[in-house]
A protein has these predicted regions:
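Flexible helix-coil transition and linker loops at the boundaries of alpha-helical arrays
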Residues: 21-23, 59-76
Length: 113
């Protein structure tokens, strides 16, 4: 029994990863945003749309512990910017309904300028 318990503890220690930093968790989101921005500058709007969608998806799946560390303005502000960028890419692709839906999500995030 002692060997089994030691084996379980050892296996847990080997597979457990250290807690990721806030920046490490946000890095994939930032990468998508940057790729989306570069694609927009290069007029590759379909690629930009994919990247902005992925950034939003990744941000919305962050652990609650990370999202609660963000104050309301930063959380809403971050998503607001990505929804706005997504709407811009969609409008360039002549996806009017999708662009309007993205703008509605932008407004729903609050703190609109």
């Amino acid at each position: 029994m002692k060997k089994l318990l030691l084996s379980v503890v050892a296996a847990f220690c080997i597979t457990a990863s250290p807690a990721q930093s806030f920046e490490e968790l946000l890095a994939p989101v930032h990468s998508c945003c940057e790729r989306g921005n570069r694609a927009m500058e290069a007029k590759r709007y379909a690629e930009a749309e994919r990247e902005y969608r992925e950034a939003i998806r990744l941000f919305e799946t962050l652990p609650d512990s990370v999202r609660t560390q963000l104050d309301e303005w930063n959380y809403g502000g971050y998503l607001r910017g990505e929804y706005y960028n997504l709407a811009c890419a969609q409008s360039r692709l002549n996806k009017r309904r999708a662009a309007v839906a993205s703008l509605a999500a932008y407004v729903d995030c609050g703190n609109c300028d």
